[in-house]
Amino acid sequence: AAEHIPGGYTIEDTISMCRILEGNVDLINVSNGSFGSREAAKLTIGSSIFMPRGHNIEEARQIKQAINIPVSVVGGLGEPELLEEIIASGSADMVSVARGLIAEPFLPEKMASGHPEDVRPCIRCNYCFSHNYIPLTPYPKRLPRCAVNPVFGREDQFRQAQCSTH
């Protein structure tokens, strides 16, 4: 929605661009940041635990109110209560969840079955990023892993447990 760098595009610029795109795109996915500086990159490269959850929700709400295109929002949204609130409040039409699904691959099923308390939460440590493609980060290249889901990145080494029936 905004680059957060001097001279970068703003939320107003984004709304103007979205209005131009009306009738030509199916969905606007709202995020913030830029790779133009380390500070702005913190908003782009998966918000860490030091960022508030859902830090893009307000911009998504502003964009949704201004245009007639479905809006999705991303950014530290792995908690079931937050996902429900975004949709219920009309802040966005859809939520984009990545790290939350790495931590808990069955997040949609657990929410749909009425068991959000069983969701293994993403702790937003960003250990899942491989850092092979992210500029401005000093991390060594390695295979992606998850601090709370030990199977992630090793699915071929683990077989799905079979439930016995009585």
Residue ranges and their predicted role:
Residues 1-166:
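Flavin-dependent oxidoreductase catalytic cores
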